[in-house]
Amino acid sequence: MNCYLILTVALLLTSAMTGTTTAGQLNKKGVTLREDDGFPCNAGNCACLPLDSYSYTCQSPTSSTANCEGNECVSEADW
């Protein structure tokens, strides 16, 4: 019984210490990307990660970024 407990704890610690994010990789600004790492918006738009969501929304670069994480909308060049 104790072996199963030790094995479970070891697996959980290994998983926690790998430093991976749930969505995969990070871009150069530290924003969590989608699994495919492709820019999610059409050319000319920027990707905003809303404060209350895990999915990016696309918007015009001139739109307000008040609801975006880090108060920024990431352009395709910065993705």
UniProtKB/Swiss-Prot annotation:
It comes from Californiconus californicus. The keyword Zinc does not apply. Disulfide bonds join 41-58, 46-68, 48-73. It is found in: Secreted. This is Conotoxin Cal9.2a. Expressed by the venom duct. Residues 1-23 form the signal peptide. The cysteine framework is IX (C-C-C-C-C-C). The keyword Ribosomal protein does not apply. It comes from the Eukaryota. Keywords: Disulfide bond, Ion channel impairing toxin, Neurotoxin, Secreted, Signal, Toxin.
